[in-house]
Amino acid sequence: MIKVGIIGYGTIGKRIADAVAMQDDMKVVGVLKVTPDYEAKIALARGFPIYTYSDRFDKFKKAGIEPAGTIEDLIKASDIIIDASPEDVGRENKEKYYQRYDKPVIFQGGEEADVADVSFNALANYEEAKGRRYVRVVSCNTTGITRVLTSLILNGIGIKKARIFIARRGADPKEHKKGPINDVVPNPATVPSHHGPDVQTILKDIDIVTMAIAVPVTIMHMHMAYIELSSTYTKDAVIEAFVKTPRIFLADVGSGFQSLAHVIEYARDLGRSRSDFPEVAIFRDSVTIRGNELYLMYGVHQESIVVPENVDAIRAVLGILPKWRSIEKTDKTLKLITEGKVYG
């Protein structure tokens, strides 16, 4: 049983904790919280011991929460650490704490790529993480792009270049201090956005350029992709690649999927925790072939898409299971859509 310590219990950390707890080959030995808020109390109710920094003990005790120990104690109690801290805090934790202990650490995409030995996506480069000390699961948008491109590559569809245009959600649903509210913001105004170079930390030979804007929504990101293929392929061949690839969902307008809100409503109707949708939601009707050019649109649920990647990263780093067995195990335990998917 792999003992997993989780540093940070926010949007990503709490989802990873729940996902790890659903596996039969790993368990959560504790989560690190900085603030004794409602999330800390929910973590306790879920059976996760709460750790914090030594100078925060009194605040937790006053809130009725008895800390199980310090961050150092949590690291010592763990076989592997998932760092789900806010952007740039992971690097600080590495320099201040992780380097003192011989424990592997998995960072998130908010950190720069050089915080880790390898950037990770389960479909694309699972094997590269084996035995690595520091691994970084790439961001939500990078994960979405990498999945889509890898689904083509795995099914023998060559890619000459990819141009991806991203409409980023302005904030997560709970982020009351972020925006925009009534604006469309170049994010950034320069080209490329960081997503293209980030994809290249995994798919190193891919010719890719990305552009991004931030829009006043909270539910999901939307990507609009132009992909030049290495040869002429039929639309059916491309659709079949998406159908077979795990963690990709094809949304049909005729079935009621007319917007990203319908994807989230579908997640709610499935009874998924927190209305999560870790799959990339490709609008089937948008998939268009013109010669060797492929066009498509797809949604990325920023709060949950990286969760299965973190579970697989744990097994990849520790060499517990080979790639496809881990991906299938994760998908089934998290109750992702597995019908028609090919694992191997």
From Swiss-Prot:
Binding site for D-glyceraldehyde 3-phosphate: S139, C140, N141, H195, G196
Annotated source species: Pyrobaculum islandicum (strain DSM 4184 / JCM 9189 / GEO3)
Keyword Cytoplasm among record annotations: yes
Catalytic activity: D-glyceraldehyde 3-phosphate + phosphate + NADP(+) = (2R)-3-phospho-glyceroyl phosphate + NADPH + H(+); D-glyceraldehyde 3-phosphate + phosphate + NAD(+) = (2R)-3-phospho-glyceroyl phosphate + NADH + H(+)
An individual GO BP term: glycolytic process
Record-given protein name: Glyceraldehyde-3-phosphate dehydrogenase
Gene designation: gap
Pfam families found in the cross-reference section: DapB_N, Gp_dh_C
Stored CDD domains: GAPDH_II_C (cd18127), GAPDH_II_N (cd02278)
